[in-house]
């Protein structure tokens, strides 16, 4: 198994695993290597084996994705289309904070400090095994308090007025419950298509925020 992974980064002979024509992705291969390396290191420490065969394995290089952002001249149309869909508050907050999608959708009304114009980020939502699961962010540094503009506070207050009995800042117009991250991503893609903008990932809105903040001298921290 490990020799196959080491030589080509692919496991084609395991036919019960459904793989694409090109085999496993670079990230998956590197993840498998990390897991095996840690296990084998422990085996060496416990004197179960003499050496770690994972040492010196040549891993496939991570491909650098070209960073894309939403062009400035598309931000207005983007937000206008979001407003038409009843989702201006969510997308406005995203473009003014650069939150991760899971962080954005896990926000509670109690996370908003209207008086001090801040929002507390302490959790994220992901779909795991078909269920929406709320958990802590990736790292301790991801737990933070962010300053937000007055307009964002106003929009969030209006948003809360639409569903005052829900603890969440943003709820799905279809279900009235927590917004599904995948559904939210699809909405982002529909907005891009509607305004004739080049496709960018939802994650690229974080890059958009960071790029524009640096351009206009805003502290992204």
Predicted stretch roles:
Residues 3, 59-62, 122-124, 151, ...:
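Generic beta-structure capping elements
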Residues 4, 28-31, 35-45, 216:
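Alpha-helical scaffold segments in carbohydrate-active enzymes
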């Amino acid at each position: 198994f490990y020799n196959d992974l080491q030589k080509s980064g692919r496991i084609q002979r395991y036919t019960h695993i459904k793989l694409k024509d090109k085999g496993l992705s670079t990230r998956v291969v590197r993840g498998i290597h990390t897991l095996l390396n840690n296990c084998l290191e422990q085996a060496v420490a416990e004197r179960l084996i003499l050496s770690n065969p994972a040492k010196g394995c040549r891993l496939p290089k991570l491909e650098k994705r070209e960073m894309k952002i939403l062009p400035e001249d598309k931000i207005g149309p983007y937000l206008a289309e979001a407003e038409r869909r009843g989702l201006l508050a969510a997308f406005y907050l995203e473009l003014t904070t650069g939150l991760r999608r899971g962080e954005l959708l896990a926000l509670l009304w109690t996370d908003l400090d209207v008086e001090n114009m801040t929002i507390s980020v302490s959790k994220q939502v992901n779909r795991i095994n078909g269920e929406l699961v709320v958990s802590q962010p990736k790292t301790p540094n991801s737990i933070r308090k962010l300053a937000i503009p007055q307009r964002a506070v106003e929009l969030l207050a209006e948003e809360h007025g639409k569903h005052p009995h829900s603890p969440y800042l943003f709820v799905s117009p279809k279900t009235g419950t927590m917004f599904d991250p995948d559904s939210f991503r699809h909405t982002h893609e529909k907005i891009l298509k509607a305004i004739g903008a080049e496709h960018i990932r939802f994650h690229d809105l974080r890059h958009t925020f960071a790029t524009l903040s640096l351009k206009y001298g805003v502290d992204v921290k």
